[in-house]
Amino acid sequence: MSGELPPNINIKEPRWDQSTFVGRANHFFTVTDPRNILLTNEQLENARKVVHDYRQGIVPPGLTENELWRAKYIYDSAFHPDTGEKMILIGRMSAQVPMNMTITGCMMTFYRTTPAVLFWQWINQSFNAVVNYTNRSGDAPLTVNELGTAYVSATTGAVATALGLNALTKHVSPLIGRFVPFAAVAAANCINIPLMRQRELRAGIPVTDENGNRLGESANAAKQAITQVVISRILMAAPGMAIPPFIMNTLEKKAFLKRFPWMSAPIQVGLVGFCLVFATPLCCALFPQKSSMSVTSLEAELQAKIRETSPELRRVYFNKGL
């Protein structure tokens, strides 16, 4: 290998220690950086070339370690990890903050009428479907039937929750009504994610030892992984949907918004965006991507298999997903 860089930098793994919350947070702040969606095709292709060349042992003269890591994260932000295909722009992790701030801000501004609830909950679940399809597993891709079932079920659940709570909160404080969209999003996540990953709940997900040696598949591990993802997704939405209602409830009583009511939506979108810039990476970092559980928590058959092959093993590891 020529060039200044050593040959053993593992750019298949994140740059920071993923066993610590700070390391995971640094990783996800980089992965979800909204500036990456502004990169040109030429910049993306250059990053892909740097990454592919480095993996083949070729380094351009003068390339620094920081530049290599920057290329790796640009590559990861735009290309599917399994297939290597360029991902749909709005389905990329770097599009999460700008897309969610727009959709969530509008959901929280236009929540009082049934047509508005139907429209914005449909838009939100359509966006979620695009994200889930874009980031589908290359080894076990979602079928059209699975994607459609999850999409319709999550949209129905979100709309039913929103309309039901709107009816219940008609005679209470307007502030309480502002939290209806959050309840709808939480309900949709509880429906959407398990349905999207129903195959894993049936057949299990691969579990390994600490060194990555595959031991089998576990549905119990899938349940833990999906639970962690649902919790992360709900908490991710919480700051952007819980803090702005208090602020907007106060602002809408002021002369400025009474004079310029059309400013409500842009202000709400901005407040949600500010919260999401921090909430998205921090909540992604709550649980390690390489999650673990005790061998005694696995299915009896898998426990027996592990006792035969690795009697001293106490914990197994698996990818929890996002």
Curated annotation (Swiss-Prot):
<dbReference type="InterPro" id="IPR004686">
    <property type="entry name" value="Mtc"/>
</dbReference>
<dbReference type="GO" id="GO:0022857">
    <property type="term" value="F:transmembrane transporter activity"/>
</dbReference>
<keyword id="KW-0496">Mitochondrion</keyword>
<dbReference type="GO" id="GO:0006730">
    <property type="term" value="P:one-carbon metabolic process"/>
</dbReference>
<comment type="function">
    <text>Amino acid transporter importing serine, an essential substrate of the mitochondrial branch of the one-carbon pathway, into mitochondria. Mitochondrial serine is then converted to glycine and formate, which exits to the cytosol where it is used to generate the charged folates that serve as one-carbon donors. May also transport other amino acids including alanine and cysteine.</text>
</comment>
<feature type="topological domain" description="Mitochondrial intermembrane">
    <location>
        <begin position="196"/>
        <end position="228"/>
    </location>
</feature>
<feature type="modified residue" description="N-acetylserine">
    <location>
        <position position="2"/>
    </location>
</feature>
<feature type="topological domain" description="Mitochondrial intermembrane">
    <location>
        <begin position="121"/>
        <end position="146"/>
    </location>
</feature>
<feature type="transmembrane region" description="Helical">
    <location>
        <begin position="147"/>
        <end position="167"/>
    </location>
</feature>
<keyword id="KW-0554">One-carbon metabolism</keyword>
<feature type="topological domain" description="Mitochondrial matrix">
    <location>
        <begin position="168"/>
        <end position="174"/>
    </location>
</feature>
<feature type="transmembrane region" description="Helical">
    <location>
        <begin position="175"/>
        <end position="195"/>
    </location>
</feature>
<feature type="transmembrane region" description="Helical">
    <location>
        <begin position="267"/>
        <end position="287"/>
    </location>
</feature>
<feature type="transmembrane region" description="Helical">
    <location>
        <begin position="229"/>
        <end position="249"/>
    </location>
</feature>
<feature type="topological domain" description="Mitochondrial intermembrane">
    <location>
        <begin position="288"/>
        <end position="322"/>
    </location>
</feature>
<feature type="transmembrane region" description="Helical">
    <location>
        <begin position="103"/>
        <end position="120"/>
    </location>
</feature>
<keyword id="KW-0812">Transmembrane</keyword>
<feature type="topological domain" description="Mitochondrial matrix">
    <location>
        <begin position="2"/>
        <end position="102"/>
    </location>
</feature>
<dbReference type="GO" id="GO:0015180">
    <property type="term" value="F:L-alanine transmembrane transporter activity"/>
</dbReference>
<dbReference type="Pfam" id="PF03820">
    <property type="entry name" value="SFXNs"/>
</dbReference>
<keyword id="KW-0813">Transport</keyword>
<keyword id="KW-0007">Acetylation</keyword>
<feature type="topological domain" description="Mitochondrial matrix">
    <location>
        <begin position="250"/>
        <end position="266"/>
    </location>
</feature>
<keyword id="KW-0029">Amino-acid transport</keyword>
<dbReference type="GO" id="GO:0015194">
    <property type="term" value="F:L-serine transmembrane transporter activity"/>
</dbReference>
<keyword id="KW-1133">Transmembrane helix</keyword>
<comment type="similarity">
    <text>Belongs to the sideroflexin family.</text>
</comment>
<dbReference type="GO" id="GO:0015825">
    <property type="term" value="P:L-serine transport"/>
</dbReference>
<dbReference type="GO" id="GO:0015808">
    <property type="term" value="P:L-alanine transport"/>
</dbReference>
<dbReference type="GO" id="GO:0015075">
    <property type="term" value="F:monoatomic ion transmembrane transporter activity"/>
</dbReference>
<dbReference type="GO" id="GO:0140300">
    <property type="term" value="P:serine import into mitochondrion"/>
</dbReference>
<keyword id="KW-0999">Mitochondrion inner membrane</keyword>
<protein>
    <recommendedName>
        <fullName>Sideroflexin-1</fullName>
    </recommendedName>
</protein>
<dbReference type="GO" id="GO:0005743">
    <property type="term" value="C:mitochondrial inner membrane"/>
</dbReference>
<keyword id="KW-0472">Membrane</keyword>
